[in-house]
Amino acid sequence: MQVDSRIVVTLTSRLYADEISKLQERVGSVVPLKDSHRLQNLNSVGMYSVYMRNVAPDFVAMFSYLSEATLAILDEVTPDTLVFSRLDHSQNYELKNVYYPSFAWHSHTLLTVVPPVFGREAATVALESNGFEIVFPVVMPHALAQAVLQKLMLYNIYARLSDANVGDVNMDHVRFHATTLHHMGRAYTLHIDQANPGGMLGLLDNLAIYLAIISALLPNSLARLLPAIMRHEQHELLNIFAGVAPPDDGGDFNIEDDMQKMESFMAYMQSVSSIFNLGPKLRLGQYSSETQSGTAWLAS
C-alpha cells in the first residue's frame, strides 16, 4: 500500500529570489522536522530550535533531537511553500550530497545524520523574508561520525579535568587535536570548543555510573571465564591481557545468583551502548559522484 509521505510547509511571506536559489541548492538533502503532520509551518523545519544564533550549542541535545525528529527530504521549493518527503523504513529515496562541508560518499556504505558540528553559518540558510533560519544537519560516512563523537567526548573529558585542576592539562594541545578532523588529505575544523558542556558532562557522568554498576553486576561465572579461555589459548589476543585477569578464587558457582546478575548486567550494557548511539543512520545503495546522488533508505 502506497503511503502518502508528502509534507507541505506553508510560508508566512513569499521567499526572495536569492533565498529560493539557496534552498534549491539543498534539494535532495535530509532535514529534521518537529512533527510528522502533512501540513506544517516554518518553525518546524531544521535544527533552529536546538541551535539558535549566539547561544552556546549543546551537541548532545542535538543528537537526541535528530534521533526523535521526523526526518524528511527537501523535494521542492516554491515562493510560498517547501515540500518534503517523510522518510519511511519501507521506502527507498534519492538522496543528494549537498552538505557543507561535503564529504565523499561511496556506494554501499552507512551514513549518519549529525548536528552541524563544523559551524552553524555553513549549515544555515537565512530566510529574511520570513524572519527565520533553516539550520541543516550534516550527513556523513558513519566512521567519520564516530570520530566526531570521540573527539567531542575527549575534548569535554579534558576540559573537565582542566577545570578541576586534575593533572597538568594543556588545553591548547587538546584543542589542536580534538577540534580537527582529517579525511582524504583535508582538515576540517570542529566547532566544539565553544559548546555548552552540560549535555556532554551529563552523558559522561552517566557513563561513569553505568560502568561502576556494571563492574559490580558482573556474574561470577563470566569473570572466571577469562582465565579459562586463556588457559586453553582460544584467542591469541587474550595473551595481551594475561597479567590483568584476576586469579580464579576457586569458589562454588551459583547459577541462581548469576542469572539475576546477568539480567541486570545486560540491561546496563544496553544503557551504555545507547550512550554511544549516534544520530539516525542511512544505508546508501548505488551512488554517483557525478550527480552527487544515490539511492538510500533508513537503516534499522
Curated annotation (Swiss-Prot):
Keywords: Capsid protein, Host nucleus, Virion
Record keyword Membrane present: no
Any Gene Ontology CC annotation: viral capsid
Compartments (UniProt record): Virion; Host nucleus
Domain of life (superkingdom): Viruses
A GO molecular-function descriptor: structural molecule activity
Known partners and oligomeric status: Interacts with TRX1 and major capisd protein/MCP.
Role: Structural component of the T=16 icosahedral capsid. The capsid is composed of pentamers and hexamers of major capsid protein/MCP, which are linked together by heterotrimers called triplexes. These triplexes are formed by a single molecule of triplex protein 1/TRX1 and two copies of triplex protein 2/TRX2. Additionally, TRX1 is required for efficient transport of TRX2 to the nucleus, which is the site of capsid assembly.
Family to which this protein belongs: Belongs to the herpesviridae TRX2 protein family.
Name of protein: Triplex capsid protein 2
